[in-house]
A protein has these predicted regions:
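DUTPase catalytic domain/fold
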Residues: 1-153
Length: 153
């Protein structure tokens, strides 16, 4: 269900699979959400570059992150994610959505740095644990939204 892992033996945990940091972007404009997706407008972002030895220092705020791994959710599975406890203990959290049956892509999440002193992250840091849940039966409909195949083309 997960491809392109940095180190599958390390990332495979008792209850799921850890996803690692590929890219960080900062928000540059406002987004818009309405009842249907016809008026959805995603905000502009700008990629932040990792510095010496692949480290980056982030100030408090919200960031869009992209993971290294490509996730493939079967028709009879859904997934939820939780931040790693080390991330929380450093004063940062991740906001995520549900991984629907049929979704395939290199997912993104919202990183929120709450620590007034910021946080330092290294490229490929393990940030999140994806937990897979088997459904009682295969989903009648599978994910077919705009994020299908995201960041892998």
């Amino acid at each position: 269900m997960v491809e392109s892992a940095v180190d599958p033996q390390v990332q495979t945990q008792m209850c799921g699979m850890e996803l690692t940091l590929q890219k960080i972007e900062e928000f540059r404009s406002q987004g818009a959400i309405a009842y249907d997706n016809s008026e959805r407008k995603l905000p502009a972002t700008q990629e932040l570059k990792f510095g010496e030895a692949d480290w980056i220092d982030l100030q408090p705020g919200s960031y869009l992150i992209t993971f290294n791994e490509v996730v493939n959710i079967p028709r009879d599975v859904a997934a939820l994610a939780r931040p790693r406890s080390s991330l929380l203990r450093c004063g940062a959290s991740l906001e995520t959505a549900l991984w629907d049956p049929g979704y395939r892509g290199r997912s993104q999440s919202l990183l929120v740095v709450h620590n007034p002193s910021g946080i330092r992250l290294k490229k490929n840091a393990r940030l999140l644990q994806l937990v897979f849940m088997r459904l009682d039966h295969q989903a009648e409909k599978v994910y077919s939204g705009i994020y299908q195949e995201e960041n892998i083309r």
